Amino acid sequence: MADKNNSQPDVNEQIKVRMDKLAALQEAGKDPFQITKYDVTHHTDEIRAIYEAHEKELLGDRPAVNTDGMDEQQARESVNADYNERRAIMDASPIEVSFAGRMMFKRVMGKASFCNIADLKGRMQAYISRDAIGDDAYADFKKSDIGDIFGIKGFIFRTKTGEISVHAEEITLLSKSLQVLPEKFHGITDTDMRYRQRYVDLIMNPEVKDTFVKRSQIIKEIRRFLDGRDFMEVETPTLVSNAGGAAARPFETHYNALDEDVKLRISLELYLKRLIVGGLERVYEIGRVYRNEGVDTRHNPEFTLMELYQAYTDYEGMMELTESMFRHLAQTVCGTTEITYNGTKIDLGKPFRRLTMNDAIKEYAGVDFDTIKTDEEAKALAKERGIEFEERHTKGDIINLFFEEYCEEKLIQPTFIMDHPLAISPLTKKKPSDPEKVERFELFINTWEMCNAYSELNDPIDQRERFAQQDKNAENGDEEAQHTDEDFLNALAVGMPPTGGIGYGIDRLVMLLTDSPAIRDVLLFPTMKSLDGVNKKNDVNNTASEAPEKNVKTESEKIDFSKVKVEPLFEEDVDFDTFSKSDFRAVKVKECVAVPKSKKLLQFTLDDGTGTDRTILSGIHAYYEPEELVGKTLIAITNLPPRAMMGIDSCGMLLSAVHEEEGEEKLHLLMVDDHIPAGAKLY
């Protein structure tokens, strides 16, 4: 039963009631799950369109009734008379329809009821009367629940309030919903549920459904555009022995039938180039790739990539194709080439700006790398500017780090960044005029890299030398280095024509064109950390088919601390006055994301009880993924001075427990009872 703090019945009780209703239907021989099909003649948007057209045909330009000079009763009578006349004309030639969908609203009024039915195209009101469908059917309808799926046959009419509706003559329960739908999604916890239970999200939020309909349209228009340029769509292997074509860590697995270790592809590149060698002059593939990396607002380990290759052109040709395609997508999908993302207008109709990487750094950082000749000079400059680098890094790597630090965040309007350093582009053709640079570009929009394109390297000798350097990088600890691919080198030795190639992140493109804030908002089922407990048994939280057991006690886990090593305690005392100046507070994690271009840092948005969000950065990404920390209650020191990290001010420090175990450092973020409110002070 409902308590004083909750007017809604207990969810488990509601589920039991629904189960009882289903049992009663089955006992009466009305099991909805025995129905195998239903004849749908129209979707809801079509019903509206055909009725409006029919109405215009029969009523023409009949003016609305003029009630000027009438008193309230006269006006009401006049309006009713006009409605009845219109209704009589329309009902004389009724349009019969049959549609189906999920019931999202129901209002029972004695012998008649209204309900809203949602299908793929929208919602439609249905008028259900006992006289029209019969006593038994109406009695069953009154017992129905929100979430049930119905088929409705009847004729279209317009209500007195002006809403186009369907007057039901026959209703059929097609599926009984045994789970209780939420009223709406809101807050952090529900955001997590939206991603985990996307099927519920699609039911409750029409704008989410619209996003994924638009995603499908975007991919369809990409294919239409490329088909118009005589490209051929192909499919290449997902499981590969050598995951090349990009700088990323692969997922690894074992192929039992062949007894071989294989990897999931991180790119589509090398197989598509083999097809260019084979004489397929224009090829593309849209497919899933997998990179064993972090999760944040713009990255998901499994994502959709589109790569295309065109023989007898170069990166200039790829720029023209990219600019034309983006313009085509904006116009066909959004209806305009001037789009808005997060309140910022982005003009895809104007010619895209073109800027070399060195010129961009010169413009935004005031450094001219064309005058810097050695790796040592570049490293010294990086130290001077406080840019972190690894000892193995070359001048080319430092140039890239400078670009990421100073330039990316400035690139809002479409900009081609061209002519990258050779060191970071192992599959790209050198510029004839400057062998330290390559014919490569990246398109940046809204600070994001939208695509990456090359004049493809087709010299097998040069390619072998670059693979050798990548192998050395791997030996020196570069986990993202590519490895020598002998079969690909053999393909190049057969002969590959001059070729332009490009890769597009489809998910990021969809984010841009749908104004979606995070990559998870454009992935139907994004990667999520598994929940403890029930989900580990392949269940979803509290399912209707099997009610959860309550108050089940589990035996405490026995922990072996015999191999644990901790730092010695401090010998120096701290007086109470000094200690009391440290402000320890409970904080709630509102958001948590990986910091771009950092493998260690997580950025926390915290509720510290003041009403103003607090940002704290913590180098714990090796131990936690961002999504598992959202909603947790942590402990922070809040009165430390702000400290800039990766260009972000970190205002405080989160407390963690650190120890060593078998030579490996272990870390546990200090999490406390969620009943502790944000801002509670620790003593």
Residue locations for each model-derived region?
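Short, conserved secondary-structure segments in the cores of folded domains
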Residues: S93, A137-D140, P498, D575, ...
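Conserved phosphate/anionic-ligand binding catalytic regions in large, soluble enzymes, centered on
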Residues: V277, L443, T447-E456, M496-T514, ...
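Short, glycine-/Ser/Thr-/acidic-enriched flexible segments
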Residues: M104, G122, F157, L178-Q179, ...
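Intrinsic disorder at enzyme termini
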Residues: A2-D31, D532-D577
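Class II aminoacyl-tRNA synthetase-like tRNA-binding/catalytic domains
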Residues: A2-V11, K16-G317, R327, Y406, ...
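Metal-assisted phosphate- and nucleotidyl-transfer catalytic regions
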Residues: G244-P250, H328-T447, Q469-M496, K536
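Phosphate-backbone binding interfaces of nucleic-acid-interacting proteins
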Residues: A544-Y683
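Active-site pocket scaffolds in enzymes
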Residues: P460-D539
